[in-house]
């Protein structure tokens, strides 16, 4: 079908543009300067998570204008709108982080409502910060209109004392400062240069992890995840994304044609191979849920276990997203994995071609140091590992990228904290001991509510030189920037009476990341007595968005989702 001869009678926008009964609706479009020809064309939502909260999303509005050019060039009518985003770098370390994960689902919901309310026919979604990427992808799969995802790009690295630095170096410097190893002046000098441009955090933290996922899963154009936010080449990708969505619309290629079980498995492979964020284990099940596909944390973890870790990126490694882009980009990583038999090459992508077709001309660059060949991986198994055992019957997850093999097992006495603030205060004052397992609980999806990330605490531990001398477990989450023996997503969470709620100070906890186990060394009879005496805790959120989230949210194992998902739906928006 030619883009200029769309049959409006089969598109959602017919409900707001076609027939005499829609004259009032058309009058609004004329008020905004649209011509009759533009009103008769397909309407394409161009959704951005732009805001001025942080550098992560500040470049999205610029790139959205290029997307609109591409849509117009392909005979579509772009309709730009913004949704919210909560930026983790600003929300970190205080009550604001409770809003972070909840924002993912609000983003998906708000994009859905905007598309439904205005009957847009297709969608290009631009996102730059941790939860905005999966939130935007979730909305695409939920709506199932032809869609293209566009990452806003990463920040450029800062430079301090001759080394590249990121915002995580600043978080870790707080720990050095509290340990008396950094003066106020040095900390201030670092904070002033760590983040020199627009863009999301530069290491293989959550934003760049999910950007890699967007390419591996096929929702983004090849190469679009790589270029840093300030680069003008991003605008070329943006314009191409606008053209691409019109091609998808013309050929009726929808997100659920692309986001299949195989595509999700490809996404899990890229997370593991790049030493990506543990949040990938939360967001992939949530994206799958929108398509009605069962793909939980432990299934994701099985793929992590079988995938070699081949990309030397911070926080476990040495390089940042800009370096990966210059080395050959996500496409080169995918090509290495495809040639090694780790990817399903027959998966459809937004180019209209298969993943293998997209990668057929990509060559490995031997003159770079970021991506390793499969013959010499950084580790034979992925940089992220799933755990299961008596402490976490529903599973848990740990990032092992950059950890030495002899540090993959830890056993020690528990030290329990019922909030992140309690633990951070103890860490900041050095009121803990080497060899302890620090337990932060009641921070799960329901119990927080909001499943906060613990970067402030883990970075402080690392900055104090204790990152490999203690372990930390939580029913909350960890930032993609976390390093050290930090286990998150422990389920069932404390708020529903999971084993983590029954731990007492001094109980021995044993974690074996090599074999994928996490156990509480306490007799079952003792645990039964504790369980009988356990009472649910009330949160301080008795109304508002976080109260609503706590009522709806499910388990971390299944992605902490807030609605029944694709399996339960009786109609899909794209078919109205």
From Swiss-Prot:
Gene Ontology BP terms: isoleucine biosynthetic process; L-valine biosynthetic process
Key words of the record: 2Fe-2S, Amino-acid biosynthesis, Branched-chain amino acid biosynthesis, Iron, Iron-sulfur, Lyase, Magnesium, Metal-binding
Any matching Pfam family: ILVD_EDD_N
Claim: Zinc-finger is one of the keywords in the record: no
Cofactor note: Binds 1 [2Fe-2S] cluster per subunit. This cluster acts as a Lewis acid cofactor.
PTM annotation (N6-carboxylysine): residues: 131
Residues that span the membrane, as ranges: none
Cofactor(s), by name: [2Fe-2S] cluster; Mg(2+)
Entry binding sites for Mg(2+): 88, 130-131, 453
Reactions accelerated catalytically: (2R)-2,3-dihydroxy-3-methylbutanoate = 3-methyl-2-oxobutanoate + H2O; (2R,3R)-2,3-dihydroxy-3-methylpentanoate = (S)-3-methyl-2-oxopentanoate + H2O
A molecular function (GO) term: dihydroxy-acid dehydratase activity
InterPro entries: DHAD_IlvD/Edd, Dihydro-acid_dehy_C, DihydroxyA_deHydtase, DiOHA_6PGluconate_deHydtase_CS, ILV_EDD_C, ILV_EDD_N, IlvD/EDD_N
Residues that coordinate or bind [2Fe-2S] cluster: 56, 129, 201
Entry keyword Translocase: no
PROSITE patterns named in the record: ILVD_EDD_2
Superkingdom, taxonomy of origin: Bacteria
This protein's pathway: Amino-acid biosynthesis; L-isoleucine biosynthesis; L-isoleucine from 2-oxobutanoate: step 3/4; Amino-acid biosynthesis; L-valine biosynthesis; L-valine from pyruvate: step 3/4
Active-site residues from the entry: 479
Subunit relationships: Homodimer.
Described function: Functions in the biosynthesis of branched-chain amino acids. Catalyzes the dehydration of (2R,3R)-2,3-dihydroxy-3-methylpentanoate (2,3-dihydroxy-3-methylvalerate) into 2-oxo-3-methylpentanoate (2-oxo-3-methylvalerate) and of (2R)-2,3-dihydroxy-3-methylbutanoate (2,3-dihydroxyisovalerate) into 2-oxo-3-methylbutanoate (2-oxoisovalerate), the penultimate precursor to L-isoleucine and L-valine, respectively.
Protein name (record): Dihydroxy-acid dehydratase
Gene name for this UniProt entry: ilvD
